[in-house]
């Protein structure tokens, strides 16, 4: 499971030219699931996201988590995070979870974040062609892979 986390002032997702979700301050999280991911990966990544101290304190030191600042989360599925470009110029997505498995993991991930955080957790529409609009704050961008926890 791989996530790209961006601290944002606001972010939104459009599908078919209609805004389907929006946050005003918090974290935009792009998430991709691999063929070997399970509930342990979801738990670990959810804890990491909620505990990451990447919001500034009064001295502009990154000292607060999204929980500390009562931010929001916008979760967007992105299987291309599992791309491999080792061979040739066309990325391979053979490490990405099959859509039916990834959808279950995506739904469980959102439920887990809502349960653990109590924050507003918005999401894109899994499998849709989405247009993501965001205003980076910093910018602060963090990449986490659950396979690196071992």
What are these regions (language model features)?
Residues 95:
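An anionic oxygen-ligand recognition environment, strongly enriched in 2H phosphoesterase
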Residues 1-88, 92, 100, 104-150:
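N-terminal, polar/charged subdomain of small-to-medium soluble alpha/beta proteins
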